Amino acid sequence: MSLIMFGRTLGEESVRYFERLKRRRDERFGTLESPTPCSTRQGSLGNATQIPFLNFAIDVTRRHQAVIPGIGTLHNCCEYIPLFSATARRAMFGAFLSSTGYNCTPNVVLKPWRYSVNANVSPELKKAVSSVQFYEYSPEEAAPHRNAYSGVMNTFRAFSLSDSFCQLSTFTQRFSYLVETSFESIEECGSHGKRAKVDVPIYGRYKGTLELFQKMILMHTTHFISSVLLGDHADRVDCFLRTVFNTPSVSDSVLEHFKQKSTVFLVPRRHGKTWFLVPLIALVMATFRGIKVGYTAHIRKATEPVFEGIKSRLEQWFGANYVDHVKGESITFSFTDGSYSTAVFASSHNTNGIRGQDFNLLFVDEANFIRPDAVQTIVGFLNQTNCKIIFVSSTNTGKASTSFLYNLRGSSDQLLNVVTYVCDDHMPRVLAHSDVTACSCYVLNKPVFITMDGAMRRTADLFMADSFVQEIVGGRKQNSGGVGFDRPLFTKTARERFILYRPSTVANCAILSSVLYVYVDPAFTSNTRASGTGVAIVGRYKSDWIIFGLEHFFLRALTGTSSSEIGRCVTQCLGHILALHPNTFTNVHVSIEGNSSQDSAVAISLAIAQQFAVLEKGNVLSSAPVLLFYHSIPPGCSVAYPFFLLQKQKTPAVDYFVKRFNSGNIIASQELVSLTVKLGVDPVEYLCKQLDNLTEVIKGGMGNLDTKTYTGKGTTGTMSDDLMVALIMSVYIGSSCIPDSVFMPIK
């Protein structure tokens, strides 16, 4: 008995002695990596974290040092070099991708991830790097670096062995093998199939592919689930998923876009939207324990095939013993540890099925056709912290009542994902020519299982006009007047320069031209929400056009003195400009638009001439220039009248103005005069709001000829463009396009 007690005491003393020796060594030389093999549950996943400490010296102060898992202590700038960080992530996470991960259900054999670290390094570079000799720290110098490295790797090891990460890595590997088997099986012995046209032989090639929008849906789903499961390890999860999806150059801001709580996908018809959601939902349920998925569509008949598809997939992969269901309403998948995941199905006609639920993912299929009251129920899930809503719908925009998702296109690019096969630069050509079906730059490619040619397009449009663009290509709705496409005209750089750069004309009168050009676009209305009178006064500043005055005038009431009031507005603005620039201008060329009313245009011209004469007689101006008016001869008449008829000059006038504006040749004076724009509003910014509404519409003409027009009324057709029209026409008339001989004084 005493021998047994002596042996036990000796053993305990020996253990304590060796522990003291180990602590002394660790304090002197740093912590050594544990050679203990991984447990069965860890599998090869744990081996990925058993990367030994590399003893190499760096000449960097401690404040600029950073410990990178799997490598060691380096300068912290290395973390921000895309090439280095991507390679480091590959070297670290390649072992995780080749492991079997957390096997939560039996009878599932996952195919190893094929990866080689040497694939990223050329043989020549590898040979050159191998010949480099690195200076090593002494044991005492290496101790703090070894301890820091061990601490980082221990944290990384705890992350890699967590149940949540095991589920995430298992999901990515299973989905990878789904693609390998064309979405038929997640087992190594699964049957082969290929989603392709039936008349195209596959020649033994069974590997499937993902469309870009399908990969985007997968990334949105995976990133959001990982942020919910592994919120404390968000940085490491992002690195892992960058490696999984092969997106090393994706920035952190873009990754946040994948984690947002709602996203919208507008995809053309027959492209595999619902077809892709079935295996995605099934695999999410079979991998993530406790997850709750919701699926809703516009009618019950649309939810039933999805319900049956998910149920059959789960039973095919894992057996019927793990799957329980309530016909057409819910599916429950059970795990071996007693946990389970659920999926709930409902149509927009019965939203009570999703009320009161606690979803992590809510898929809204054919969302453009969801009933309005159901939309309110769905949007209510945005208030849930751990729920993401994914709207998926076709690009049907034929009816305003079924296009509420497409109306989001101007609100946020991060929210809306529109799938199309024609880029914005080439969309006008596709819309103008009836045989074009794809983008001529080949940047956007159509799937192999889509038949898209000129004959198909003409056939589709024979059944219903514009059906090709709206239903098949996923483009924009055509204008009622013909084939059309609108796009902004002014560049962002030119617009910012126009707002910020305003030279002083008062201090630089010597370089100003001696001629002022005035254009008046009259409007006889007292409704401030309708069109008003636009007045623009411009001149030359060296080779540039400079704006001296802008007026947007609305009548207080419709009376017999309306023409006189408009004339007074123009005269007052002109008088202020002449007072600010004494002895500078010798001629003023005035153009009064007479398209709406020639009599009123003549009356405005007379009012301006009379009121300007009053200023001259009152000695208000130090020197009065000569006032000349544009004169037109109406058809069938031999007398010239002081008004300007705007006919086909508008398109070339806008072309000239846009070219000069984007070249920086249209500027505003620092002493710009505006008596009608509110004091709290900058007249230049007020003008820019109207310039932003100017769009070009390209229409298909006879044969292959395109015609273009311009509109400044905005998408609703109700925006004001009076000030913009006055400015554009004043610049155009002041150019050499119109001779000075048409300007004459009023006699």
Swiss-Prot record:
A motif (Walker B motif) lies at residues 361-366. Pfam families: DNA_pack_C (PF02499), DNA_pack_N (PF02500). A motif (Walker A motif) lies at residues 267-274. Keywords: DNA-binding, Host nucleus, Hydrolase, Viral genome packaging, Viral release from host cell. One of its GO terms (biological process) is chromosome organization. GO terms for molecular function: DNA binding; hydrolase activity. The active site is at residues 366, 521, 593, 722. A motif (Nuclear localization signal) lies at residues 194-198. GO terms for cellular component: host cell nucleus. Its EC number is 3.1.-.-. It is an enzyme of class 3 (hydrolase). Gene3D superfamilies: 3.30.420.320, P-loop containing nucleotide triphosphate hydrolases. It comes from the Viruses. Component of the molecular motor that translocates viral genomic DNA in empty capsid during DNA packaging. Forms a tripartite terminase complex together with TRM1 and TRM2 in the host cytoplasm. Once the complex reaches the host nucleus, it interacts with the capsid portal vertex. This portal forms a ring in which genomic DNA is translocated into the capsid. TRM3 carries an RNase H-like nuclease activity that plays an important role for the cleavage of concatemeric viral DNA into unit length genomes. Interacts with the terminase subunits TRM1 and TRM2. Interacts with portal protein. This is Tripartite terminase subunit 3. It comes from Varicella-zoster virus (strain Dumas). The gene is TRM3.
